[in-house]
Amino acid sequence: MHIFITGIAGFIGANAAEQLLKAGHRVTGIDNLNDYYDPQLKQARLAPLNKNPNFRFHHAAIEDPDVLKNLFEANSFDAVIHLAAQAGVRYSIENPRSYLNSNLIGTFELLEAARAHPPKHMLLASTSSAYGANEAMPYQETQRADHQMSFYAATKKSTEAMAHSYAHLYQLPITMFRFFTVYGPWGRPDMALFKFTDAILNDRPIDVYNHGNMRRDFTYVDDLVQALILLIETPPSDTPVTTEDSLSPVAPHRVLNIGNNAPVALEEFIAAIETATGRSATRNLMDMQAGDVPATWADTSLLQALTGYQPKTDIQTGVRKFVDWYNSYYS
């Protein structure tokens, strides 16, 4: 298959491309390589991909309609994995305009390009933040998700609605996946695992929000990528697979959680980092950050029914692999 990935130089995009290339697929990717975090880290993720003859990289922004139009005209993509986005709940409070451009306009331009040259399946990234103030645990795809707590979450929930309209109007098979706190080697510097590891190894205190009373459904990146690969060949059909299927009644459109189905307390997460680094953390206990939620928990039963997906990586193993990568990369 020929697969198009947006946000190819990102943490998830580069990992997905690596696994797809290993499986013998062709991959074309696009990324604007912006400076939200260190562009050299993005270039380092791309370096091994660029050595593969089945890989093509385009340095451009998805908000540019001509770029996507030309790419879709010149290629026949079997599947699209849309990962390009301005990420980060906290950053969106101070820089909302960048989320408007990348998340909303960029997704619109991608949907327009796909409308003219339809792939067999589009997989578009949403987020667990789309569940907003919902306190019913675990999060299930058929639950109401109406009260987003940050502009980032609002833009991602909006892309779900945009995608549904295109699926209905143009019969584009679209799966929206809400992923839950993805972590692992090559992770983003703005994420807790990277920030905590960097601080602990450099004898700085870590900021612990809500005084540590937080739980997250941490999802190891290899598990997430395996779910995406399984989903590529599972586009929405006319028939629900469970009684709680989020399949739209009027469009080939489905929303799916991708998580670990096992929330981890923040203190357990920090303890895993302390064990992996061999050092103790100095905690700076703080109030809850605006736009954040105290807990997330993915119900993955629909994903399991569709693909047989089973996450394989526990938090201790995943954190250790990240710390090993961090020490190697920054040595």
Predicted ranges, named:
Residues 19, 200-331:
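C-terminal substrate-binding subdomain of Rossmann-fold SDR/epimerase-dehydratase oxidoreductases
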Residues 137-138, 189-197:
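A glycine/serine/threonine-rich, flexible loop-to-helix segment
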Residues 15, 40-44, 70, 91-94, ...:
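Generic recognition of short, well-ordered alpha-helical segments
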Residues 158, 162, 166, 196, ...:
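Hydrophobic alpha-helix immediately C-terminal to the catalytic Tyr-X-X-X-Lys motif of short-chain
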Residues 1-182, 228-232, 309, 313, ...:
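N-terminal Rossmann-like NAD(P)+-binding domain of SDR-like oxidoreductases, especially those catalyzing
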Residues 63, 87, 187, 264-265, ...:
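Short alpha-helical
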